[in-house]
């Protein structure tokens, strides 16, 4: 909801996620549990009554999120899963969670007929491809941008994926 409010005040924007991402994560959590981990990947999943109820809530949220996405987003850049999860203990997800989320997002984008570009490769390659797709004028080199981002990430104790 907060995302939609912020986006509504802008003429145009680039975002690192969407209402669809939030809905997808919620739906997959109702399937795999609130804290999917390696045990989840082995098939050890216990779905409580609370999760079953949450699934119904998420289905309803999904119709709103889908309508909003269809009206708001011109296109998506989809970054496929190419890097392993960082073993930092901060991400309450598993490889199975990532795969299911990835698949549901792509199915939903197709269902809604929202155009998307699948952009893979190293961080630098991804940035180059995205800049070309959207004809973005660089204000610094990609190498400089990545270097600055990595330095900033260190300030937040963020484990850097895709090195």
Residues covered by each model-derived region:
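Generic secondary-structure transition motif, activating predominantly at the C-termini of alpha-helices
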Residues: 1-9, 28, 81, 134-138, ...
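Conserved nucleotide-sensing/catalytic segment adjacent to the nucleotide-binding pocket
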Residues: 1-40
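Secondary-structure junction/capping motif
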Residues: 15-19, 122, 141
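Short, solvent-exposed loop/turn segments at secondary-structure junctions
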Residues: 19-22, 82-84, 123-124
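PAPS-dependent sulfotransferase catalytic core
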Residues: 142-163
């Amino acid at each position: 909801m907060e995302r939609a409010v912020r986006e509504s005040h802008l003429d145009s924007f680039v975002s690192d996620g969407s209402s669809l991402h939030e809905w997808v994560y919620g739906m997959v959590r109702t399937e795999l549990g609130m804290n999917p981990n390696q045990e989840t990947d082995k098939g050890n999943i216990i779905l409580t009554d609370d999760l079953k109820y949450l699934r119904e809530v998420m289905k309803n949220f999904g119709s709103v999120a889908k309508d909003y996405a269809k009206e708001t987003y011109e296109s998506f850049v989809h970054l496929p899963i190419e890097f392993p999860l960082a073993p930092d203990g901060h991400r309450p997800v598993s490889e199975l969670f990532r795969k299911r989320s990835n698949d549901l997002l792509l199915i939903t984008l197709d269902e809604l007929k929202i155009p998307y570009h699948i952009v893979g490769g190293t961080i630098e390659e991804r940035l180059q491809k995205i800049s070309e797709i959207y004809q973005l004028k660089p204000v610094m080199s990609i190498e400089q941008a990545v270097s600055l981002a990595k330095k900033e990430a260190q300030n937040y104790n963020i484990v850097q994926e895709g090195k």
